[in-house]
């Protein structure tokens, strides 16, 4: 086996792709800051007990585990930054009011989440803590759509779901609670035959409601059908009202309702949402409310947020990231050195062509050149 062979679904990021990813990262973090979000940087490794707190079965399966050579305890290589940020808010910052936090960093998955998906994502996201009202959910959704627009993804479809619907049905039927992960997997995968099999022995009202969820998909009018087909429970009524309000407020995206889009249900407690674009089978961004996660770290806090994979969004983004630059010669000239330094201080990209390599610079678009005119170095358009 070649010594330079990388593991499956792990890849290097080469200059052109890396430049596009980094430019997008900077733009998104600047936009998050314009909304008032503060940057945090959780560690790549944590003790497994802390890393998986409140994360559910799926997060456990996706997390690489190793032994700490100092303590002998098990460490986890993070697969999701969101629970780490919840820990920071609940345990370290300990603020009483609304807190807005954002982050960007690498995460690793034991298995790819799609056929061609990478197992090392660059996750970027934003979270609001301390406000239980729908205003926070709406702000997060607007910020996510704003981020996707910055990436050049204009035609976005926003799918809305609510964890409270399934939670209410399970709470009303103890036998449904015993089905646990199998029921969730069947719903998330829209595996209707499996769902029929699992619900065969449930009471008719709960059985029919669970079987209806995969079919409750469409525009906002599907909420009227949901009210007719689902049991008249206060929790379900509130969930459907929340979805109706948010669907009416979203600007700049097609809104769809999908009451079986339950990926991430394990730690979500309210509204859940996913963003899709044409030509990409999987969601390009996901988010939702997870009010109970902070409680696992010692302090219950209302929380909602979203995240996306920078590598995937940069890959599908039509925004051109080829950097324009100034081409300068390589000479032992003090005036040239001063001119180049001044241009770089002003934010310009200046590349000095090393002798014999004047044509090895295809990664950059040289629209200007630095030339000597009457003893002065000046920037001119490149012919």
UniProtKB/Swiss-Prot annotation:
Pfam families per the UniProt record, alphabetical: tRNA-synt_His
Subcellular location: Cytoplasm
GO cellular component: cytoplasm
GO terms (BP aspect): histidyl-tRNA aminoacylation; L-histidine biosynthetic process
Associated pathway: Amino-acid biosynthesis; L-histidine biosynthesis; L-histidine from 5-phospho-alpha-D-ribose 1-diphosphate: step 1/9
Keywords per UniProt: Amino-acid biosynthesis, Cytoplasm, Histidine biosynthesis
Subunit description: Heteromultimer composed of HisG and HisZ subunits.
Note from the entry: This function is generally fulfilled by the C-terminal part of HisG, which is missing in some bacteria such as this one.
Name of the protein: ATP phosphoribosyltransferase regulatory subunit
Gene name of the encoded protein: hisZ
